Amino acid sequence: MADCPYARCIQERRHIRRELLRWTKNMVFVVGLERVAEELMGRRRWKQYQDTLYSGTRSSESLTAQAHHRLYPAFSSSCDPVPGNLEQIGSRPLHPPASSTSLPATITTTTTTTTTTTATAAATATTTATGLIKQETLQRHHHLQNHHHHLQSTAVQDHHRPYQQQQQQQQRQQQRQEERRLRPDEIKVEVGEDEFANGGAARDESKAGSTDASTPATVTTTGATTTLPAASATGTGPATPSAVVATSNATAAMTTGTTTIPTRRLRKRRQNDGEGADDRDDDEENEEEEDGRGQSEAEKRLKLDEDADGAVSPLRREKDRGSREYPTSNATDTDGTKERTEEVALDRTPVTQGLLRVKKEEELQEAPSCGGGPTILTTPGLDSDGIRLPCREVEAAATARNVVAPFLIGSRRTSPPPEDWKPLDKCYFCLDGKLPHDDQPPLSPQSDSSSSSRSAESPMSVQVDPMAASVVAAALTGTYPTLLPQWCLPPREAPLVGVQPHQDSATPADQPLDLSAKPKNSQDNNISLLEQQKIPLRMTAGIDPKSIFNSGYRPKPRMSGPVAAVAAAAVAAAGVGGVPVVGAGGGRRAYTEEELQAALRDIQSGKLGTRRAAVIYGIPRSTLRNKVYKLAMERERDASLSSTHSHPHEPGAPATTITTITTTTTTTTTTTTTTTTPNTTQNASATTPPPQVDEVDDKELSGAEEEKEVEKALLKPLLSLEDLVRFSTLEGSGGDSLRTLLQRGQETGAEWPGLEHANIGPYIQKMIAAAAPFKGMETQDYRIPEVMRRLMSEDKRLSKSVNGDQSQPPHQQLHHHQSTHPQAQAQAQPQQQQQQQQQQPQQQQQQQQQQQQQQRGPMTNDDFNPNIEEEASDSAQGRAILKIPSYKPASTPGCSSKNGEPTSAAFAQGFATAASSPGLLERASPAFSGTSSPTNSLVGKTVAVNFRDVIAKSISVKFQEGQTVSGGGMGGCQPGGVVQSQQPIMTDPSPFKRGRYTPPQPANAQQGQAQAQAKPQSQEANKPKPATGGKGTRPKRGKYRNYDRDSLVEAVRAVQRGEMSVHRAGSYYGVPHSTLEYKVKERHLMRPRKRDQKQSDDKTKETSTVTAAAAATNIRPGTADNKPQLKPQKPFTSPGGIPGPNGIKMPSFMEGMPHLPFTPFNFWNPPPFMPSPFMAGAPNVPTILPEQYFATSRIRGLQEQQRNAAMVQQQQQQQQQQQQQQQQQQQQQQQQQHQAREREGVGAGIAETSAGTSNSRGAAQMSKVPRDVSEGIYDGSGANGSFLDNLIRSSLETGIPRDQRAMTEARNQQQQASSQQQIPESMRSKALIDQLCRNSRRTPVPRLAQDSSEDESYRGPSASGGRPVPERPERVPTVDLSPSPSDRGRNDDGSDRLTSPPTPLSISRAGSRDEDSTRDSTKLDRSSREREVHNGGQQEDRDRKTLTSAPQQPQQQQQQQQQQQQQQQQLNHYPDLHNLYAVPTDKKSACDSKLIVDHSSQKTQQQQPQQQQQQQQQQQPQQQSQQPQQQQPQPQQQQQQQQQQQPQQQQKEYGAVSGLVVQLQRGYNSGNNRSGEQANSQQQQQQQSGEPVIGMEDSVEQ
């Protein structure tokens, strides 16, 4: 099968498909690559056979020099346009040279081209025993990398200039073959001129004869297509026709080698030779060889380089010559040549690696330049025409010709026609699963892990050749958008670029991260491998190929481990095939360690089964299974140890850490390279670093490959950055939304429970790699890259924590990373922030990671933060595939107390908390970040280890304690109900899988949180059994009920969303696919949802009441609050924040907050990151905000409409009553709030972000009765209904604090916090319809007007202290965020909000970046709402203008707002987070329009209540200064203020959730002060005119 090109091609196709699936979910691209692979396979086989036939048949046909020249003119004509266009050079010049490839100068051409390119050196080494040419070739190759453009233009000029001369000279050369050392220009021109003179007939003849001469010439032509005249001259008199024929054949071979050259060449050849198959093959070959053959050519160059470097010995030259000759025989089949060349390349892979990469880019740019990949593509592209050969190369080629030409001619065999697959002499399975020429990853994972020496040698070119070449071509072409870059990289441009420069500087020689530097091209994100290939091509100009070699080699060591690293280093040092072709696997093994690791990664990630992996990677299935189980057992054992104490996060934390550190130097480097740079290195199997990471994670996670697959799917999950980016892209404001999400994630602590670091790390690294082109733009302004880095750092820390290195305090490491060079900074900042969240345990993890990185010396640059962060995950994962520091189910830090080990559910919950409310997490930092810091570190770290731990060991404990802890223990665990509730959420996610998969769990946990807690013990019984033990971990057949309903729900949703097939979802979520098939149908899914929701509803109502009571008792939900919260959040847990990435689970959204972090990922509209809801209204806010956040605009709209119909009357009545009560309360509250805000200036923010004060809780309870009624009316399912009602009501009724009447006293102290909580619960019954019927609520437009004036007076009392005001502005943005995602996005700025639902509001709030800006943002919201109401979408600009130009309100308000901002920032720590991630003004300006627009749209959709509250908040300072201006009755003002306070509180929480928003807000401080003033004046108008215009129903409809 190995010798069968078809089998090899099939494997290549599989590999391509696998890598494409890994790297991109872009089916178009996948299909394209698959088609390319198929065509390549077919073409290769046909080309090899036909080339052999043609070379054998036509080798006898000697074309005259004129015929050869005729061939050349076509090339020459093609080459003429080439100089201007590298791509043309790659395509057009290659084609003409392909037709007239100077195979007449077959040997000389080969030598010249080889000299020109690596192939020149290879040909020289092959034909000539001179090592000088080899060195020259390598040197020239490097020079060409840097100067190929220059050479190309020079060669083109020379080509045009000497055409006539060269025609004559070529004729003379053919006559006098010894005078082969014509100037490259002359040689090329001569060929071109002859071709021009002798048009197509000679070309046909040349083709006919060229095939014959092509055998000898193919070797040479592959090496040097440019030296056509030289080849002609080289060919002795008798050989001149032969040489011409060889030139034709060389052209054909070059065509094969070069994508573009092959096309024309093959077309002409088809015309001349009637090669219909070649026509098809070459057309596609041009497509694929542009990609695949560009790489094939690169690989040919590799082989030629190997010939030059490694084949110095005559025997080797002979062998190489045979190889080349054989490909020449397959003149058209560059693949044959490539395989030959690769055969040589295997020997020379180390040297070729850099050359290959460089040339690949050249090939990609100029790939067509010369079919013989070795030719420098820029000049060689012309070289194939005889134009392109640079002078040095020509000289070297001439030398090679003179020395080698006779030898080659004498020894050049008329391509042994039927000698089908000489390159395949060793089956790819035998050759470490790689064909010598098939090193190219397309062969299959072999290339990835096949021979570590080989991967190290040419990780990019060898591994990725066919598919990677196609991908690279596509990337270069921009065929498919870079998956991550476009989505995630709006912010990535600056920060990722910032990371990239370090990558670039360090990667060139040192690091596997060189691949990362290579993927710097934006397209690189899609296919790291291809990117690496392509980027080295692009980077080669800047990066020395040798550096690339080194970096390429390093990734290899990582792949092969320390031995591989040594071998790779040796190879890099030798520059020749220092690593045996067999690879690191060893002579006795047909597979390399790298392949084994790649296979294990695939298996663990669930990408492959052991059976398929065994076939693909050529590794015995028994070996794979043994390794997988061994890893799983080790992981579980270590996880058990880790679960024993939540600190050791990974199974073999210390021991494995040392091993991993060593392996990390090699394997981690490999993994990092695999993830980022190594993607190229692990092209075939590691083409998708995330899969590798996931594979590694799965290994860690599960002992059973099946379970591993599920685990990987789950780990992969939730929201892979790809999904996140994809949704962000779909959102339209992908950058902002993703930025907000990621930044909030940073605030959260950088470890996103929902995001698998294994997934995110590779994805982030892809992002960073894609941002590499922007590395010059490095700024930490873009916090997404920082967050991404932090995610990667989190993985690193997880690895470190697993390794047990948790020494540095978070801030120390934070500062250490920040103070460290940007690379370390990029690494460190994510780690810093994560560590800030995770604090010392993760700080220690980070330190250990840093130590590991230091230990990985070469990986310092490899440790390029994204890479290293990913490397942290990969390093933990890649070091030992066993180790997957992706998220083990670490309980939230607070919930770490559950089992002492974080559960994936806890982790997801923690992340939900962190993501949901960064500020609150900061506030809860002691409990969530601080208390949970070990757990949070575990959250990231233990997720991999604890997936197994928690599932095997802790699942029982978790579910036992989880029920207890999540029921009541969580309260103790968490500082507030927020973290605690999240912990239960996380708890369920951990159990919901076989126990291994935390990430998907949160979604499942969200739906089944209540169930999960109800059935934790049953799950304990079930899951520990599958999870515990190496072999016991694999779920046994027949344990069909062993899956969590949450997992089932999540799987069903994933299938329904079209994210996965039933089978994949079944394995991914660990549920039987047969069951899943039935459940996928809506009716089946609805039943579990209803049950989950009913449980959630019951618990939510329960919890709302209990939480309200607890809130009344505790400012932050205490244990009692947490317990209710947990129950309300059990619905949240059902969604399980993590599943969001897989797809937003609407029911899960409704059911539980934990899904939020992922929901924002999925839908940037809902992304008003659940954090604030959790943070602010522990039980109530989470209940309310989850609806707002989780309920997509659609769901919210539908539910709101339903509730509208049912509750309009009730709400209106309640609104009237509440308004009256609120007016009274607000009057009282204005006084009380003034005092309370002064008191709460410091504490109110905390109280607000806490579950609200006890009064707010009490009010929430009181209002929950109507809420329960409305829930009963609206949603029998409770979880969805109650949460949606709460969310919708809170978002809709943010302006209508019905609870305020009950909370009059509570509001004095807690108005903001209680607004959020009270409104959610009390508004649930009334406010929902009132908000839905915002018109009724907006109907009191005077309120808005009053709000404008009263907001000040309302704020006046509270803002008099100046502290309450800051709290509210903080919330204002938060409010905008929370309602805006649900309301504004749908109603007013559906598009904007959809674009960046959480970010826009927070960014509109961010637009008024300060707390001043926040209050101003409320003003802006009003003004923008008003404008939007009046002007539609133009209010954005007006709002901005208002911000900038119309400071109509007293600066007193601004100052008060600023004070409020400062105070709130202090209180919330969320502003501090923002300070940590301060967004520069540029970013603000960049986000301003979108943010403001979103803000206005959100405000409009939130509509007047939020605006009123915001205005009140904003205007409270104004009111303080302008109380005389207050013309509206205070009761209404108070009501409005309360209403505004609720949204503000929510917004404040959202602001805490969305650090980015706060950052933007801070950035917008100055602008927002103005805008706040202006907005106040305008907001009054808006209140009057705009408020009634847009109603909640409008937002619901939208």
Curated annotation (Swiss-Prot):
Residues 965-975 have a biased composition (Gly residues). Residues 140-151 have a biased composition (Basic residues). It holds the Pfam family HTH_psq. GO terms for biological process: memory; positive regulation of DNA-templated transcription; regulation of transcription by RNA polymerase II. Residues 83-105, 140-387, 436-462, 495-525, 636-705, 797-877, 962-1045, 1082-1145, 1248-1283, 1301-1598 are annotated as: Disordered. Disulfide bonds: none annotated. Residues 164-174, 210-263, 445-461, 653-687, 820-855, 1003-1021, 1103-1120, 1309-1318, 1447-1466, 1501-1547 have a biased composition (Low complexity). One of its GO terms (cellular component) is nucleus. The modification Phosphoserine is found at S444. GO terms for molecular function: sequence-specific DNA binding. Residues 1562-1577 have a biased composition (Polar residues). Residues 175-191, 292-305, 315-324, 335-346, 1093-1102, 1383-1392, 1407-1442, 1481-1497 have a biased composition (Basic and acidic residues). The second H-T-H motif is necessary for transcriptional activation. This is Mushroom body large-type Kenyon cell-specific protein 1.
